[in-house]
């Protein structure tokens, strides 16, 4: 048996550097460690500030999903201050949030994920030349329109929010805009342009409605072969190519999922509360663990720091959370190896376990029984996971599936706006309170917990989808979701382990750096290689 350790540093940049160490035995990853190698500390910055500081500070955590940070920060204050949010404001928040995610979908797919499909390791595939033609960085026939048109949806965000990224137009009690009929019609035209010129022309090769008719894995396979346009669309080609090169065979992860949900039915969330949140959601929250569905309850969330560079080794709920960094050198002596905390969820009957966040988690929650009339019920990915299991391929398909779904919703919300009604209700700024705000950013569940005392922020904790997915081992030794997903991955070429990139990117880890590989035992650089198509 041949055993080696492989260090990949940095593997990418998501709210800081990502380093990965894996043990490989006979060409298969048998253990993995993910290290968030950069300290953030936004929670520390917010302590002692005005409660509305979160509206300004948290969107700067991320340049690509700042709108998602603003969305959940606004709802955290809405629940803490018991505000009234007019239905129009909820619709605008929904539209803006959806448009930010819509821009992320093609940008992520072509610029961060699909270029790996041109890796020389796949040159023996009969479809390799076509993959190179479509997905090569900058010059690919699908890469160019996909990346260029990815910017269209956030033009809609800017119409309502004044700018994108880093807008601050969502505030407790509503939104700071008064859109006109011209604003709405421009927004409709922009989304139609994006749909016609990318989503239906390049990705689907058919209408949004036809794709959304697919409810089972068999439906998807039949859809591919239904006609030449669908067979040769980027979606049809991606399905065929992934199955040919084996991306449907690894990257499973824990198989347990968390979605906190997003988008509210306007008339059901005019007075936001923590307890009333789940019932008002359109894109549902939920837990899928050990083959069973459970209701999401924010009170069951904790953050473990046993293997994180923070004081102590206890788990705390975010309302009582602490962010007390220590010297990494001291931390390593205690067995700590990452700046990320380890979020865990107390699943009824199971206990605290790691859960995968992201598009696949959202799609699993959407497949749960019992959806109300206003809520999304979409059984496709529950069916796929049950029949072929989670994988790099299935995780990626879940992300792309949401392009059609969110576009349809955003278009409907634009029609629902009543331009003669209010978009804001001035709140009473309470000096004491606790609030919880959450959303589904493009890469998964994103949440804020705020504690207000004497009119100032006493505690502010942000739990990102990256933390859910990339967090290290916990006090029980349970691996984080990406660590689990890396285990079992085949490594064709130790000098160019593109498979590691596939797995990490299927969680949308935004990896954009050239990578060096080192033998973990000798320290010798094996090679300098590119796993995302750019140097």
Question: How would you describe each model-predicted region?
Answer:
Residues 458:
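Catalytic-core signal marking the mid-to-C-terminal active-site face
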Residues 1-443, 454, 464-535:
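Active-site bordering "gate/hinge" segments
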Residues 448-453, 461:
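A translation/RNA-centric and nucleic-acid-associated enzymatic feature enriched
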